[in-house]
């Protein structure tokens, strides 16, 4: 990740609109800040959410609430719970997220 020169700024997430994205099951709600080439998001997965696609984009994901499950294309499964963080590079490991109980995530990509 290349973070270009960017003056100090703060954001109040309460002012960022929410976008609803349907999954294979359930839905995700995104709040998005685009800062040059860096996307910063608060994402909430509903209970019983499952992504409708495999993702090959790199992310840094921190779980703020709940639990998220990640299925990797090679068959591995990883669980991310409150206070945990994961990272994956662009084109590294195709992955697909789901959540049984719902979760709230802070994501940088």
Where on the chain are the PLM-derived regions?
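A short, N-terminal "cap"/entry segment at the start of jelly-roll beta-barrel domains
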Residues: 1-41
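Short histidine-centered beta-strand/loop micro-motifs
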Residues: 50-55, 72, 97-98
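Short, conserved beta-strand element in jelly-roll/cupin
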Residues: 54-70
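Short beta-strand segments in beta-sandwich/barrel cores
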Residues: 50, 67-71, 85
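Short acidic-glycine-tyrosine-enriched beta hairpin
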Residues: 74-91
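Conserved short histidine dyad/triad with adjacent acidic residue
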Residues: 36-55, 89-92
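Ligand-binding loop in jelly-roll beta-barrel domains
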Residues: 90-109
């Amino acid at each position: 990740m290349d973070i270009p020169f960017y003056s100090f700024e703060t954001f109040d997430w309460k002012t960022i609109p929410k976008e609803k994205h349907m999954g294979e099951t359930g839905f995700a709600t995104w709040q998005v800040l685009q800062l040059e080439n860096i996307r910063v998001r608060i994402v909430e997965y509903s209970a019983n959410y499952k992504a409708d696609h495999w993702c090959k984009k790199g992310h840094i994901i921190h779980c703020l609430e709940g639990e998220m499950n990640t299925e990797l294309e090679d068959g591995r499964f990883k669980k991310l719970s409150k206070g945990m963080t994961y990272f994956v590079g662009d084109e590294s490991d195709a992955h697909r997220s789901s959540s049984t109980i719902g979760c709230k995530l802070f994501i940088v990509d």
